[in-house]
Regions:
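Substrate-binding pocket helix/loop in short-chain dehydrogenase/reductase
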Residues: 96-107, 203
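Canonical Rossmann dinucleotide-binding motif of NAD(H)/NADP(H)-dependent dehydrogenases/reductases
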Residues: 3-33
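Active-site helix of classical SDR
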Residues: 121, 158, 166
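Residue(s) in the substrate-gating loop at a strand-loop-helix junction
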Residues: 141
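Short, small/polar-rich loop/turn modules that mediate ligand/substrate recognition or access, typified
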Residues: 174, 179, 233-235
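C-terminal substrate-recognition "lid" of short-chain dehydrogenase/reductases
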Residues: 2, 118, 211-245
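Alpha-helical segment proximal to the catalytic Tyr-Lys
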Residues: 126, 171-172, 231
Length: 245
């Protein structure tokens, strides 16, 4: 098992990529705390994992709240004794905030997609330091590399912030044995569910592998970076996009 006896937190773990990551981590031997605002969904995922003899629990968490982060990490350590891995997966899309020219939407995207990563990383790193090691994986996007007028400007900016903050954090926490890396997914079915068939087809045509990705394909990349297999990798950017960029 690639994560045997590890303890992980996965934010946004109630659905989509986060759920895939949480389930894969448990299959690979980890205990996982699922953090999300979607209480019913998060509790259902944790219960389903537990029913299959896995170790998982759910903690309702607003990732933009420092006090919620403190509670999440404290409950994780109280339950499982330590924290080895954090996946900063929680995020929202530009469509969730509406008007691309409104400051309110920009501010919300920055808070959920970028400030949450700063909060989680600094607090998780502090909890990992007594262990002398740890792994933090921050989920960005291919939009963290390339801007597009098709997206809310705050979305690309927030994902770019995650990419660069990850490099800063890798440098800052590396001497404590804590690795920090970013993952940049391309287009997945959940991201295009609300779009028309023409847009979906265009994204597939622009992807050299001529298909959309699946959450589990991103999860396997996250698993690698979280595991000891990546013990000499920090500050890197793993793009999982079928060749889109």
């Amino acid at each position: 098992m690639r994560l045997k006896d590890k303890v992980a937190i996965v934010t946004g773990g109630a659905h989509g990529m986060g759920e895939a990551e949480a389930r894969l981590f448990v299959r690979e031997g980890a205990a996982v705390v699922i953090a999300d605002m979607l209480v019913a969904d998060g509790e259902a995922v944790a219960a389903d994992i537990a029913a299959s003899q896995g170790r998982a629990r759910f903690v309702r968490t607003d990732v933009t709240s420092e006090s919620d982060w403190q509670k999440l990490i404290a409950e994780t350590i109280a339950t499982y004794g330590r924290l080895d891995i954090l996946v900063n997966n929680a995020g929202i899309s530009g469509s969730a905030v509406g008007d691309p020219d409104a400051l309110e939407g920009w501010t919300r995207l920055m808070a959920v997609n970028a400030s949450s990563v700063f909060l989680g990383t600094k607090l998780a790193a502090a909890a990992m330091m007594p262990n002398g090691r740890g792994s933090i994986v921050n989920i960005s996007s291919i939009m963290g590399f390339v801007g597009s007028s098709e997206n809310h400007p705050g979305y690309a900016a927030s994902k770019g912030a995650v990419r660069l903050y990850t490099k800063v954090a890798a440098s800052k926490y590396g001497p404590s044995g804590i690795r920090v890396n970013s993952v940049h997914p391309g287009y997945l079915p959940p991201m295009l569910n609300a779009t028309n068939a023409g847009t979906r087809a265009a994204k597939i045509e622009a992807t050299p592998l001529r298909r959309l990705g699946e959450p589990i394909e991103v999860a396997y990349g996250v698993l690698f970076l979280a595991s000891d297999e990546a013990s000499f990798i920090t500050g890197t950017e793993l793009v999982i996009d079928g060749g889109y960029i």
